[in-house]
Regions:
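Glycine-rich/acidic phosphate-handling loop/turn and adjacent ATP-lid/helix
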Residues: 505-543
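Interfacial/gating helices of multi-pass transporter permease domains
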Residues: 27-47, 116-121, 181-184, 224-228, ...
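Membrane-interface helix-loop junctions in multi-pass transport and translocation proteins
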Residues: 153, 163-197, 325, 384-415
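Alpha-helical transmembrane segments of multi-pass membrane proteins
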Residues: 114-139, 337-360
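Small-residue-rich hydrophobic transmembrane alpha-helices
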Residues: 36-96, 136-154, 262-319, 359-371, ...
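Short membrane-interface helical motifs at transmembrane helix boundaries
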Residues: 93-123, 127, 316-337, 344
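Conserved ATP-binding N-box helix of the HATPase_c
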Residues: 466-493, 548
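Interhelical loop/hinge segments that connect adjacent transmembrane helices in multipass membrane
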Residues: 1-6, 200-236, 425-439, 533
Length: 571
């Protein structure tokens, strides 16, 4: 699943990030360092929208995926529609407040009319920027559920096209129509508006499980995914506080040019963040599925692959910036920067920290996929507030060059702190390990019956009664037999069987053949058998019996594999 879901994701992340930082790139070339500074002052506002977008999307999408894996489709759709409603409501309220209180917002960001040209450019940039942020919020909410349904590829393509369109429209508005910085924010607005509309239409007309309904989850069912989502997205609000403090420190230590340099470093960080986040976001649905299946072996394997991948990419891009720093000139056009070596130095120090940042972001996504909101919040808090701000304040005592070392120091210290906290929490955890049997094998009669014997012995040994053991064996034999009949010679099957405290059994089956629901055989051959046909199809009849004896049965073609989930309850 790593190669199918994750391998190409950094390319999409790089494309998205270049579009996201396109405003700074374009105004740097077209206007100058003052324009970069004007755009840079809005970094906290971008972080606020990111905080809301990921807080309202990720936690709910993970709960949606878990409910689907448990066969609870109606409850899952209620979660989806509840968070869609909350997201759309938020996307109306926030820009309305920003537009009503523009002067107050600019003052809060550290701008005043005394800043002259920078203030005027920032004021023209604001309206389309906040409108675009609202539609970006809606797009992210819808796309998070699409990734957790079965549309990872479409979601990545849509967001990449949105980013490229943003860049293209901004180029036209800035260089052809001479709209200045406002033209860049207009490109951000119109591209995200289109992406939100396309996302909604895709959900309406696609063959996935998602659908818009006027049926919502009760408040108590919404609170947990809210906590889970905002535990991670709190990094953006913490980041906004961190950015404000960093900007004020740079203003006191140096001048507006230092803020422009900081914005360049922040834009470089967006490339790394998007790259690492795309690895985390595309792997998160798979982590969530493995977690629901209690498949620790595959979950740990996927984590190792993603971790190695993140470290390799972080090191490679850091080496590129260090050996060939002129790439920063090509991106941002720094002709009016008094000393380009200041930017190169800051970028090199940030690059060292980015390697550890990749590890942190991946750890956040994996912890979130487990539903551990406390663990996620601990890591997020340590990165930005717990270590980030104290280290920044200490380094500011040693001058403007020293403050850039905050990037590697806060990442290393936060990872060390999170490791210590995780060890303490694990030592205090008293819950017993779940009884789980996981296996993967080439589907043939010999392998199947060998695994069935082992699974039956496993279930019986963990207190499952004889009747449930018989139903478990029957269901697996019939389902795998039907898959083998409709598959090719080298069908691979992955099984996960978990025995719960009440001695009920959860079963997850994944196979590698083309899209095929084994229970469609029962409908085609038995329930809808043509009149006059007396011959009984035993595979179809067997699947009917399995359907009768199982609960929470759900089939999905997910991440390129047929996935069946069901439950066998004690009578």
């Amino acid at each position: 699943m790593f190669f199918r879901s994750v391998l190409a994701s950094p390319l999409a992340g790089i494309g998205l990030s270049l579009a996201e930082i396109g405003d700074s790139i374009l105004v740097g070339h077209g206007i100058g360092i003052n324009a970069i500074a004007a755009v840079g002052f809005f970094s906290p506002v971008y972080l606020l929208f990111s905080f809301l977008a990921f807080g309202l999307s990720t936690g709910g999408a993970i709960v949606y995926n878990n409910l689907m894996n448990e066969g609870k489709k109606d409850e899952a759709l209620r979660i989806f529609n509840s968070f869609t409603l909350v997201g759309c409501t938020t996307a109306v309220i926030i820009p309305a407040l920003c537009l009503l209180f523009q002067d107050g917002l600019l003052s809060l960001l550290g701008l005043s009319p005394a800043d002259g040209e920078v203030y005027e450019m920032a004021k023209s940039y604001l309206p389309f920027m906040v409108l675009g942020g609202s539609f970006e919020l809606i797009t992210e909410v819808l796309n998070a559920y699409m990734r957790n349904d079965k549309d990872v590829t479409f979601s990545v393509i849509l967001q990449t096209v949105c980013g490229i369109s943003n860049l293209a429209i901004s180029i036209v508005m800035l260089f052809v129509f001479n709209w200045g910085v406002a033209g860049c924010s207009f490109g951000f607005f119109i591209s995200n508006l289109a992406a939100a509309l396309v996302s909604a239409l895709y959900i309406i007309f696609s063959r996935g499980e998602l659908e818009f309904r006027f049926r919502f989850a009760p408040l108590r069912d919404i609170l947990k995914p809210l906590r889970l989502g905002f535990a991670t997205s709190a990094e953006y609000i913490f980041g906004a506080v961190f950015n404000l403090i960093f900007i004020h420190i740079l203003t006191n230590l140096s001048d507006v040019e230092a803020v422009g340099i900081y914005n360049i470093i922040e834009d470089i960080s967006i490339v790394f963040i998007f790259m690492f986040e795309m690895i985390g976001k595309t792997s998160q649905p798979v982590f969530t599925e493995y977690h629901a299946e209690h498949n620790e072996k595959e979950k740990n394997r996927l984590f190792r692959y993603c971790l190695i991948y993140s470290v390799i990419l972080g090191v490679a891009f850091t080496v590129l910036m260090t050996v060939y720093p002129q790439v920063i000139d090509l991106l941002f056009g720094m002709e009016d920067v008094s000393d380009a070596s200041k930017v190169y130095f800051a970028a090199a120090i940030f690059g060292i920290g980015s390697v550890f940042m990749g590890i942190s972001l991946l750890t956040q996504n994996v912890t979130q996929a487990k539903g551990d909101d406390k663990g996620v919040f601990a890591l997020v808090f340590l990165r930005q507030l717990g270590f980030g701000i104290p280290v920044l304040l200490i380094l500011s005592l040693f001058g403007v060059n020293a403050v850039w070392f905050v990037y590697p120091l806060m990442e290393v210290l936060s990872l060390a702190g999170f490791y210590i906290i995780s060890r303490i929490r694990k030592s205090r955890k008293k819950t017993a390990e779940a009884a789980v049997y996981c296996t993967s094998f080439l589907l043939n009669d010999e392998n199947l019956f060998k695994e069935l014997d082992s699974i039956e012995a496993f279930a019986s040994g963990h207190g499952v009664d004889n009747s449930s053991c018989s139903k478990l064996r029957l269901s697996l034999e019939e389902i795998c037999g039907t898959v083998e009949e409709h598959g090719h010679d080298d069908v691979r099957v992955q099984l996960s069987v978990a025995v719960n405290d009440d001695n009920s059994v959860e079963v997850h089956i994944r196979d590698s053949i083309s899209e095929f629901d084994p229970f469609s055989v029962a409908a085609e051959r038995v329930e809808n058998r043509p009149e006059g046909v007396d011959e009984v199809d035993f595979h179809g009849l067997g699947m009917l019996i399995v359907r009768y004896h199982t609960r929470n049965l759900l089939y999905r073609y997910y991440q390129g594999f047929n996935t069946l989930t069901y439950r066998i309850e004690k009578e």
